[in-house]
Curated annotation (Swiss-Prot):
Presence of keyword Disulfide bond: no
SUPFAM superfamilies: P-loop containing nucleoside triphosphate hydrolases
Gene assigned in the entry: arc
Induction (record text): Constitutively expressed.
Name of the molecule in the record: Proteasome-associated ATPase
Amino acid sequence: MSSTENPDSVAAAEELHALRVEAQVLRRQLAQSPEQVRELESKVDSLSIRNSKLMDTLKEARQQLIALREEVDRLGQPPSGYGVLLSVHEDKTVDVFTSGRKMRLTCSPNIDTDTLALGQTVRLNEALTIVEAGTYEQVGEISTLREVLDDGLRALVVGHADEERIVWLAAPLAAVFADPEADIIAYDADSPTRKLRPGDSLLVDTKAGYAFERIPKAEVEDLVLEEVPDVHYDDIGGLGRQIEQIRDAVELPFLHKDLFHEYSLRPPKGVLLYGPPGCGKTLIAKAVANSLAKKIAEARGQDSKDAKSYFLNIKGPELLNKFVGETERHIRMIFQRAREKASEGTPVIVFFDEMDSIFRTRGSGVSSDVETTVVPQLLSEIDGVEGLENVIVIGASNREDMIDPAILRPGRLDVKIKIERPDAESAQDIFSKYLVDGLPINADDLAEFGGDRTACLKAMIVRVVDRMYAESEENRFLEVTYANGDKEVLFFKDFNSGAMIQNIVDRAKKYAIKSVLDTGAPGLRVQHLFDSIVDEFAENEDLPNTTNPDDWARISGKKGERIVYIRTLVTGKNASASRAIDTESNTGQYL
C-alpha cells in the first residue's frame, strides 16, 4: 500500500470485493434453487407413494389378522347338531327329534318360529338352541304309501319286509291336502305337488317318523303313457268295417249314456283287437282315444282343441317282473290310476298291446307259472267290487288263441274284432293314405294323364295293387302241406299288411330320391313302386319259420288245418325245402 492511499478507501474496496463475491455466490445459489425445489418435490411425491403403499399393506395385514382371528374362533367352536322339527308351540319353543331323542328346545332370537315348517331340518348349537333353519332330508328309506289318514297330516306306509308304520307328512306333502277337491295344489310356486295316492313311493326317515318327498317310480311310469294320441280315423285305410264296430262299442256308451240307461243296456267293459301283425290294431286303439275325446268335448260344448282323454298304453312284455307279486302290483296301480282319471268324468282307455304275452292261458307256461296269478288280477280289476266307470280296456294280440279264455268271455272283453289282412280294395285305400297329391310325380307319368295328378296317382295305385294281388307265377310265396296231406300254394297277397304297404311306398320314395341324384329326373314313377314290391317280396322269402310252421302260420293269421311242412316258392330264388316237423303244443313262447 502506498502512503498516498487513504485507509478508508482501502477498507471500502475490500468490502466492495467481498460484496461482489457474496453476490456471485448468491447468484449461483439462486440459479440452483429451482433444481433443488424440483428434487425436493419429487422426493415428497415418492414418500407419499411409499406411505400409501405402507397404509394399504397395513390395512391388508389388519384384514388378514381379523380373518385369521375369525378362523381361529370358528375352529374353536364346539360342533353343531342337527334335528328334525316335529312341532312348534305358542311360547316359541319347538319339539325336535335329535340324536334319537325327542326334545323341547328354544330358538335363537334371529329365528322366526312362524316360518318354520314341520319336518324341516334345524341346526343346534352346543346349548341345544336352534340357530338355523335348513331344508328337508334328501336321503332315507323308501316306503310305499298305503293310505293317508283322515287328518291329512299322517299316513300309513309299508316299509321293508312289509312292516307297516304311521308317519307324519312333511309340509310339502301335507300341503296338498289343504283342499280336498283340488287335484293340484301349489305348495311351492316353482314346483306344484300333486295329491298322494296309494302305491306312491315316499322318502321316509323311520327314526324321526316323517315322510319328506314322493319318489317317482320309473318302473311303472315307463309302462304308462298318459296322452291323447294324434291319430284320426281318416289316417287308417282299409278298415272301415272294423272302425265302425269299435266306434259302436266304445263311443256310443260314452256319448249316449241316457239311451243305454233307458234300454238297460250295459256298455262293454273291454274290446279285443286280434289279427296278423302290422294290420292296424294299435292304430285303431289310438284313433279311438282321439275321436272319443273330441266327441265328448263337442257334447259338453267345449272346443275340440281342448279335448281331453287318457290313453294308458301298457307295454305288455315290460310289465312282467321276475319278483313274485310285482306284476300284479303294477296291474293294480295301472287300474288305480285309470279310476282316478275316470273319476273326473273323462274317458280312460287302458290299452294292453301284445296281450298274449301277459295274460296267457293258465297252466300253459313251460318255464314259468306267472300267468296263474296275473290273469286273476286282471279279472278282479275288470269285474271286481270296484267298478270301472268311464274306463274301457282294449287288448291287441296276434295270438288270441293263447289268451286265457276267462278274459275273453262276455262281460270282460265283450267285443272281439278281427283285423284282417287287406284285400285288393283295402290295399288301394291304404296306398291312398301314403301316395298323396303333394308328392312329386315324374313328368313322363303325368304326361300320360294330361298332367292330372289325381288321375295319375289313382292309376299308379291300381296298377301297383293289381301287381301285388295277381295270382301269377312271380307272386307265388309258399307251398304248405297240411296234416291230412293236402297242399296249398299261398301268394304274397295272403301275407300282405298295412305295414308292408307303407314299407313298399317308403322304398319307392327312396328310389325316387336316388333317381334325382343319379339322373336329375325328379318325381315318383310307377316303376319305382314295382321295384319296391319285388324287393319287399324277396326280403320275406326266408322269414317263414319252417321249424314250427303251424305256430308261425297262426301268428301270420293263417288258421285251420295244422300245417306240417312249408316250402318257399319265390321266383328267381333258390327255394330250400324244409324238413317236416310235427308241431308240439304250446310252443309260442319259443317263436
